[in-house]
Amino acid sequence: MKQLKIGNVTLPNRYILGPMAGVTDLPFRVLCKEQGAGLLCMEMVSAKAILYNNKNTESLLEIHPDEQPVSLQFFGSDPKIMSEMAKRVEERPFDIMDINMGCPVPKVVRNGEGSALMKNPKLVYEIVSAMVKAIDKPVTVKIRKGFDDSCINAGEIAKIIEEAGAAAVAVHGRTREQYYSGQADWDIIRQVKEAVSIPVIGNGDVTSPQKAEELVKQTGCDGIMIARGAQGNPWIFSEMITYEETGTLPERPGKEEVRDMMLRHARLQLKYKGEFIGIREMRKHVAWYTKGLKGSAKLREEINRVESYQELEELLFQRL
């Protein structure tokens, strides 16, 4: 099993759960860890929200003792605030600090944050170097192919990130303009790999063990980041590990296994978020878990009326 070293942190394997707002919360990360994910990326956290002691941010910062190694992702555009807030949270039990330079969401981009930073190489350097100087933990950065077709500069930005002292860079093979549409351009990941000597983590359209193998062959990347490919599919990590070790694909989980995983996920949601929020958040997860299963469209419709764990359990046992 190939390991991956990021700064002074050694990951047990190269398969990384990518950060997804509203998805990679503590309950989901625990499930992915149990399936063997080598690194778990938390939901992005606003550096300004930490500065202003936003109460909702505290729950985003919660880490389970069993989930290391884990990466905490900041977003922002002010080097001073970002570095000072990184220092403020450094004592928490995360292993790696990541900087979000890939988020395509309009309200983030309008503030000059997320993927908007791809248009400002000078500020990229200032943010990364300030963060690296502020904390002892490794700093990584997640970027995109570029902002749009007129600004494809992942290679240039990756070099700046390396010069500023980052320990690794993750590259999503789409521009901000593309969001998640079309196909990810893996060739840009190869170009970044050739441009820098720090580890490069490839991201985009990795939905199976074969795709992960293909990504490594095409790009030479050091790590593989799985984001949407893990939605409703925490098994993807154990499947990738088995495939790397044996060259064979394990059987996909059957209906009963999917149902058991959903109920375990729901119990974790309730434990950390209470029934009201936990059950509502499970609705989207159930839609992902059951995608492609017979009768899943009807189930998704019914799930939106479920208000309690008991109702969820009864419905899943009826339908699956």
Each predicted region: which residue ranges?
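Alpha/beta catalytic cores of nucleotide-metabolism and tRNA/nucleoside-modifying enzymes
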Residues: 1-3, 11, 15, 21, ...
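Aromatic- and acidic-residue-enriched carbohydrate-binding clefts of CAZyme catalytic domains
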Residues: 118
